[in-house]
Design a protein with these regions (language model features):
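Charged (Asp/Glu and Lys/Arg) segments that form or flank catalytic channels of large polymer-
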Residues: 4-99, 103-110, 184-264
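Conserved aromatic-histidine-acidic binding/catalytic patches
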Residues: 103, 121, 155-166, 231-239
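Residues in well-ordered beta-strands of folded domains
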Residues: 111, 130-134, 151, 218, ...
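Short acidic, Gly/Ser-rich segments with clustered Asp/Glu that frequently serve as metal-coordination loops
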Residues: 114-120
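Intrinsically disordered, low-complexity regions enriched in proline, serine, glycine
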Residues: 120-121, 256
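E2/UBC-UEV (E2-variant) core
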Residues: 125-186, 259-264
Length: 264
């Protein structure tokens, strides 16, 4: 490797050639971020691992990982969807109109959180937004099951909300391809790929070949703070409206501190 270590910059290349593995490389997408010391932002290339691209790469190049972390078997998929038969979100869901959907639809969940990365425990602590996804039928530890989408320092987000809006718009672009089960003919900015580009040649072909697997966003794994900041949930810190978006309790009609059965 690397001429017995003399050329260390070539070691990764040589290792990949010897193992015949396909490297999973992050893409970049342009987002407006805050520029320190100015009231405006600048556009920067942010590294991102598109869920649909990673989904397809694992299926096509890492079948062992696919069977362990994403989809153990079509029978497991069918068993999962049978267990969701009474779930309200399943009623009139567009995937149920697809042929053999119970054996092709892979349920996924997105996890998001703000993670302290510098000055932990200090008043000047800086955090990072980390988003990842996982299959809901796979097996493994948290480290093995969760696949990174993006990580960004919270200080980069513009106060206007533009950064987050565009970030989620780009992620939705990827999730739509995951749900369609096909590569899009358009990039995340809405521009059509050229017919002679690799992206253009694979446009509207299946992510997972003849098996036709596709991903369905079926779960959100976040704490209440993240649900409020990212998805606009009812603010649990406003006690006049109640502490939880799923519960009708408040201060007056259904007092959240009154535990008598007559009040429930």
């Amino acid at each position: 490797l690397g001429n017995s270590g003399e050329l260390k910059n070539n070691m990764n290349r040589d290792l990949m050639e010897l193992t015949d593995l396909q490297a999973i490389r992050p893409s970049t997408t342009r987002l407006p971020v805050k520029k320190v010391g100015t009231p405006w932002g600048i556009y920067c290339d942010i590294s991102i691992l598109w869920p649909h691209s990673l989904f397809a790469t694992i299926f096509n190049s890492f079948q062992g990982a696919w069977c362990e972390r994403i989809c153990p078997s079509k029978d497991e998929l069918e068993k999962f969807w049978d267990s969701q038969a009474n779930h309200p979100n399943l009623k009139d869901h567009p995937m149920t109109k697809r042929a053999n959907w119970k054996r092709r639809a892979v349920p996924i969940a997105i996890h998001g959180d703000g993670v302290p990365v510098t000055g932990c425990g200090k008043s000047w602590c800086k955090s990072m937004l980390v988003l990842s996804w996982c299959s809901m039928v796979g097996h493994g530890s948290t480290l093995e099951m969760n696949f990174l989408i993006v990580s960004m320092m919270s200080a980069l987000f513009m106060k206007s909300g533009t950064t987050k809006q565009l970030l989620w718009k780009r992620i939705v672009w990827s999730l739509q391809q995951l749900f369609d089960g096909q590569w899009s003919a358009y990039d995340e900015y809405g521009a059509k790929y050229g017919d002679r580009t690799p992206e253009g040649r694979r446009a509207e072909t299946n992510l997972c070949g003849d098996d036709g697997f596709f991903g369905v966003l079926w779960g959100l794994k976040q704490d209440l703070e993240h649900l409020v900041s990212e998805f606009g949930w009812k603010d649990y810190r406003r006690l006049d409206t109640g502490p939880c978006g799923f519960c009708p309790c408040d201060v007056n009609t259904f007092p959240w501190k009154d535990f008598r059965l007559a009040k429930s």
